[in-house]
Amino acid sequence: MRFRTYKNTDLTVSEVGFGLWTISTGWWGNFTEGEAIALMHKAFDLGMTLFDAADTYGNGLSEELIAKAFPNQRDEIVIATKVGYDFVHHGEARGRGQREIPQDFSPEAVTRATDAALKRLKTDRIDLLQLHNIRMEQVYDDALWKTLEKLKSEGKVRYYGIALGPAIGWLYEGVNCIRERELTSVQHIYNMLEQHPGHAFHDAATKAGKETMFLIRVTHSSGMLEGKYTPETKFPPTDHRSHRPRSWLLNGIKKVEQLRFLENAERTLGQAALQWLLADDRVASTLPNIYDEQQLVEFAKAPDTVPLTSDDMAKIEELYSDNFCVEEEPPKFKGTMELPQETAVA
């Protein structure tokens, strides 16, 4: 495993981290507590030190899993979590889907959520607190950012940032927040197949002269870039991918075939997908979706595989600019996200 340090901080993270999204939400299949903790222990043994949770993942479950998995290793791991969704009052309304629930970014709610997360994590500090899917209103809410500074001064939070996704959007929220605020970290979707709006976030930080670095989620385009899907692939009903249109699967397979040149005897396509991300020094860490031990080992070894060449990078850029030679309707991205009215009612 290799490590990177966020600029102007003492926050060092493994280049491949462990996102608890897959083992705590039920959207990637169901895991027993024992199965989830076993994967986390294996990740730690493989050198992963960054564990990324959210208070809304499993209505607090992801944070509780960290506390149970690492009761005696607090100084050896980096804990990142997220606040912003009012799951205390609306968690049961979400059901199995990816439906959003109401948010509350008031200073009181953020403070309360942070204190609750600390209790679930059984720790005295959160290494990286992320505002979960902020809207434009929060970008310009000075009271919110003063609250984060207060939490930092109290020692409850070491560093803070924002986390955007899983829906692809939040372009202007992300870009404006990077420009207007001093963020240690921005977590967002980014991979060889889905480069928007992530590329815009990275460019915004560079152009604004900001030291913000990035945590990358959905590194393999919901498993597509692992290169294992076929037209016959079927997902269980509890898996969120079962709700995607069939065109997503068929067109994705066609795109992946154009990337097979990245595979070789020393590197899988899944590892190449992580190497593509790590070629950008603005990326602090990657958070692949992990749901079995074989995959965990493959991803953990990715930083030590052969890096992509400049020719590889240029070829990927060329393919992306031509949509990987696949004809399909262009995706409809939302530049500014809005919480649907029907989910905003208590």
Predicted regions and their residues:
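Acidic (Asp/Glu)-rich catalytic clusters
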Residues: 8-10, 68-75, 118-122, 149-152, ...
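Beta/alpha (TIM)-barrel catalytic core signal, keyed to glycine-rich beta->alpha loops juxtaposed to Asp/Glu
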Residues: 134-319, 323, 333-346
